């Protein structure tokens, strides 16, 4: 899902950089509010995200896809804004030092994988957790989040022939199904299984991370 240089035109790239500036600002403010006891876990999860993004899963159509870990971070930190800054740091490092994703497309990549993915995944999880439990809800959230991010990336590709010809040549009818397919059948299921397993394990060893803010406040008041 890392968009390389040359696929998005300069107008699109500039647009996403402008969008991400206030989002990064808000994310940094949210990070400063994070419980200091969660910071070591955040560091581990950010490193985990870096690792899983480096492993590409083969897709039957000849392409590859990869997990991200944004929904997992959002769930365990109970804050998708924190996931945004964590994933953005990973993507910036990968673009600059590993050539994975273009420098010009950092804004777009951070929007797709650092905003769309964790926010969609986190709120799907929140909607479902009281109905099916944290473990299953986390897996579904991770699946929906990564597929949503892939579809948004597909729309960005498909928009180029209309607004900036000379960059990605594929229309929506090609780009969106291609991106969705790769993540529906490989990265999506992988993200769902891995996220659910990690949430299950962390729930056993750190159940306090799954105590809602309301429950914490009522416990203090009691």
From Swiss-Prot:
GO terms for cellular component: plasma membrane. It is a multi-pass membrane protein. The keyword Nucleotidyltransferase does not apply. Keywords: Cell membrane, Membrane, Transmembrane, Transmembrane helix, Transport. Signal peptide: none annotated. Gene3D superfamilies: 1.10.1760.20. It is found in: Cell membrane. The keyword Membrane applies. The chain crosses the membrane at residues 3-23, 39-59, 81-101, 102-122, 135-155, 180-200. Its main location: membrane. GO terms for biological process: transition metal ion transport. May be involved in metal transport. Belongs to the CbiM family. This is Putative metal transport protein MJ1569.
């Amino acid at each position: 899902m890392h968009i390389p240089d040359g696929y998005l035109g300069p107008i699109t790239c500039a647009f996403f950089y402008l969008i991400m500036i206030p989002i990064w600002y808000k994310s940094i403010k949210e990070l400063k509010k994070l419980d200091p006891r969660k910071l070591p876990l955040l560091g581990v999860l950010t490193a985990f995200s870096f690792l899983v993004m480096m492993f590409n899963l083969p897709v039957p159509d000849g392409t590859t896809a990869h997990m991200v870990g944004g929904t997992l971070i959002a769930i365990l930190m109970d804050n998708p804004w924190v996931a945004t800054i964590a994933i953005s740091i990973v993507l910036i490092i990968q673009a600059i030092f590993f050539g994975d994703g273009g420098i010009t497309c950092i804004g777009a990549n951070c929007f797709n994988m650092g905003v769309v993915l964790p926010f969609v995944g986190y709120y799907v999880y929140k909607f479902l957790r009281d109905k099916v439990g944290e473990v299953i809800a986390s897996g579904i959230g991770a699946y929906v989040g990564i597929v949503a991010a892939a579809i948004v990336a597909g729309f960005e590709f498909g928009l180029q022939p209309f607004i900036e010809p000379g960059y990605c040549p594929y229309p929506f009818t090609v780009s969106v199904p291609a991106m969705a397919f790769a993540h529906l059948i490989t990265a999506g299921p992988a993200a769902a299984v891995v996220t659910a397993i990690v949430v299950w394990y962390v729930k056993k060893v750190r159940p306090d991370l799954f105590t809602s803010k309301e429950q914490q406040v009522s416990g203090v008041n009691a």
